[in-house]
Amino acid sequence: MAASEDGSSCLVSRGRSQSDPSFLSDSSATSTDAGENPDEMDQTPPARSEPLVSGIRTPPVRRNSKLATLGRIFKPWKWRKKKNEKLKQTTSALEKKMAGRQGREELIKQGLLEMMEQDSENKACSPKEGSQPVQSEPPAGEQETLTSEGAQPGSPSASGTDQVSQDELLSSDAHLDDTANIPSASTAEEADAGSLLPTTDEPSQALAGSDSLDSPPRSLERSVSQLPSPPLLPTPPPKASSKATKNVTGQAALFQGPSMKNNEPALRGQLATPTGSPHVTTVHRPLPPSRVMEELHRALATKHRQDSFQGRECRGSPKKRMDVRLSRTSSMERGKERDEAWSFDGASENKWTATKDSEENKENLMLSSELKDDMLLYQDEEALNDSIISGTLPRKCKKELLAVKLRNRPSKQELEDRNIFPRRTDEERQEIRQQIEMKLSKRLSQRPAVEELERRNILKQRNDQTEQEERREIKQRLTRKLNQRPTVDELRDRKILIRFSDYVEVARAQDYDRRADKPWTRLSAADKAAIRKELNEYKSNEMEVHASSKHLTRFHRP
């Protein structure tokens, strides 16, 4: 009997009834095992809630409860996998975009690209590989020990610490998105920031800072701890690690007090100095992507235009040089005012150098700053060119483009340098003037005199008497025509003037009182029928209609 029961237990996993007292102890044991590895707990589907009613010796009969189908529809253990896949997709897409803009090594220097090839155990860089060691994330074992030390004394043992470490790993994944979203800075900022190597991950700074402050005598096996380094301020944790902060010790909560809340916006955009560096970097606020792109475009455009401007200055006259300098200084002052309006609390010197270099590029400045609002619709260069050609730009844009063109119109000296306008000395100009004067004088001398024109009857001599005589003749001619005009009767006799009544026979109608009763309004039905009959007979007999147009004639119903 016992052997048969053992064989059946190997084949079918029998669930105990809830009335069995050993059921509670088994459930507590399984819960502790699940607490030790939360990943397995999340991935295993929930057990079917089907109470098994067992008889004395009969096998248990399954009864489907109401919650049996819930496991098929509601699967929360698959949500975390989907979230992780989405995070991986977004991080890979962002890293591809950033790698397309700049080189891989520059991105690693700026701390914007996290190494995808890193294994789960991230070790600190050895001093042979780089001149300055870079702080890396502690491995999973150290994270567990850190969180277990920082756990509250009254917290429930191992499950809470494992949850903290798991949430911190999630927060580091989420923070990788934040670091990848930071736009690439301008080339001027890269020159100053290239010498400093920022740390790769901000959550690792938080862990290292809290560890060094909570337990200073503890020695971790890292190359960073051996160097004499100033204590790093822990950066505020990202939003994804809100669950982890609830389980952290009271010491850590006291350390991240109101002072850290005040410093949060400054530290978010700050580049952390590597350990051992004597100076601290200046605090930079990350520029929005549109302004970064504008500064990059300006810097590229100034490189192309600097050579041409220098050549023009060398060849131009001293007066022209003074004009160019004055125009440049005025445009530089304008650009400084614009940059002061754009800048945040403290703008760095790199921005100023970039804007000073870009002042020579007038067209890009005008289009980027003054036409900023109107050019939002025309982000694409092809659309902008099409709108300029077709004339569909807004009026303000047209005016500003025209002003830019007029302002950047080449001078006479530049046209002469390009051989568009020929170079001439004063003597050559004088000779050309003399030739033109001679041509004009010849034409004037060849013009015929007044006597010659009178002889040809082109120009007539006029006196007052002759003019009056001509007027009299015209009047006599007109009066003669008017006198010889025939009368109406003569025209009627000649049948030249014909009235309408000459064509139509007029029937004299009796005058009647319009306000009196009209007799034809008092017609009976028989009278109307007789009138219709007479009209139809007249039409059929007297009026000849062509066969093709017979269908157009009206026939009054008798």
Swiss-Prot record:
Phosphoprotein found in the keyword field: yes
Gene3D superfamilies in the record: 6.10.140.1750, 6.10.140.2130
Segments for region (Disordered): 1-69, 81-288, 300-366
Broad class of where this protein is predominantly found: nucleus
Positions with biased composition (Pro residues): 228-239
Molecular-function GO term, any one: protein phosphatase inhibitor activity
Compositional bias ranges of the Polar residues kind: 1-11, 144-169
SMART domains the UniProt entry points to: RPEL
UniProt biased composition (Basic and acidic residues): 94-108, 300-341, 354-363
InterPro entries in alphabetical order: RPEL_repeat
Biased composition (Low complexity): 18-33
Residues in RPEL repeats: 92-117, 400-425, 438-463, 476-501
Residues with Phosphoserine modification: 229
The entry's keywords: Actin-binding, Coiled coil, Nucleus, Phosphoprotein, Protein phosphatase inhibitor, Repeat
Taxonomic superkingdom: Eukaryota
Modified residues (Phosphothreonine): 69, 235
GO cellular component terms, A-Z: nuclear matrix; nucleoplasm
Subcellular location field: Nucleus matrix
Assembly and oligomerization: Binds PPP1CA and actin; thus inhibiting the protein phosphatase 1 (PP1) activity.
Family per record: Belongs to the phosphatase and actin regulator family.
PANTHER family: PHOSPHATASE AND ACTIN REGULATOR 3, PHOSPHATASE AND ACTIN REGULATOR PHACTR
Protein name: Phosphatase and actin regulator 3
Annotated source species: Mus musculus
